Amino acid sequence: MKINTSLKVKVWLLSFLHLLVDGICAYTIFNRLYITESNTIIIIVFIGYNTLAFLSQPLFGYIMDKIGNENIVLTISLIMLVVGSAFPLSRYLSLFLIGIGNAMFHIVGGKYSIYLSCDKLAYLGLFVSLGACGLALGTYLYKSIVLKIFVVLTLILGSICHFRKDEIIIVEPKPSFKISDKKKMKCIMLLILAVTIRAIMGKTTTPLFEATPDVLIVIALFASLGKAFGGILADFIGIRWTVMLTLPLSLIGYFFFRSNLYIYLFSTLLFNTTMPLTLFLSNKMFQYYEGFSFGLLASVLFIGYLIGELYVYLNLPYLLLLCVSIVLTLFIILYVNRKVEKSV
């Protein structure tokens, strides 16, 4: 694959668009689609949006791996998001547009960041990082001016992306899509488990201090910083040392100091360093199918969230879950990374 260096600019733009896109979707859901007295409608919106935005990503990823045209798909996804959020459409039409638009955008961003990575993780971490900030801003900032600003910025950055020359010059022919290697399948299933665990922990690891909307936005900021930092750190010291350094420290922080704001924030940063690592390792399993690889791991975030929601509802013990989850995630990433290193 031959890549123009200006692709770096596009990934930076897509990272900021990630914040805007997730912010637009969160604002539209919480300040429009959820505004009803019917609990049934709220449940339909919740399940419908997350099914479209997350569970459809492997399908869109596979299709885009086959047809390409990332820049066109990016433009279409942003138009769908703007129309679905800024225009007075019916509830379910808006739901469809922002759900599908969100899924398509994430696949495009994932593919571009993987194109650029070239065995580096920093740009994967950069793209995925700001989504958490967008979700928090869209959820907890209630003024309509927030949506207007996000939409205008999305149109500006989207236009810049659209009119930039396509940076991907040559892409090698893709082999047929198949997973017949049992060892590779085992690694993929383990990575899916690791991502599911991260989603469960994101739902269950709540602070023991008062979490005002402002504090929740700051927590999201540190989660974003952790994703970006994970990619940068792994490029310097490797995946193995990154998880051996960050995950045990996050376990200590979450286990003993959830009532301390500053240690909780630092632990959140450390725990989220694993996101670009799992994406990188997954792409090594699905070489040439970057979109499907990215979409597969993204799709299980919703499943993990539901499991975490059930865990909280049943009031099951948190500290046991914390210890098992972090230790298991640590060993999964170490195991899969060792398999990837041996195959190179």
Where are these regions (language model features)?
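Intracellular juxtamembrane helix-capping segments at the cytosolic ends
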Residues: N102-C118, N272-Y288
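Extracytoplasmic gate region of multi-pass secondary transporters
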Residues: C25-F30, S180-K227
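Central cavity-lining transmembrane alpha-helices of secondary-active solute carriers
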Residues: I43-M64, I217-F229
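A late C-terminal transmembrane helix in Major Facilitator Superfamily
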Residues: Q287-L322
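Symmetry-related core transmembrane helices of the 12-TM Major Facilitator Superfamily/SLC fold
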Residues: V146-D166, P317-R338
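C-terminal transmembrane helical hairpin of 12-TM major facilitator-type secondary transporters
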Residues: R240-T278
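Cytoplasmic membrane-interface "Motif A"-like loop-to-helix N-cap segments
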Residues: D65-I79, D235-P248
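Helix-loop boundary and gating motifs at the non-cytosolic
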Residues: K2-N50, I197-E210, E309
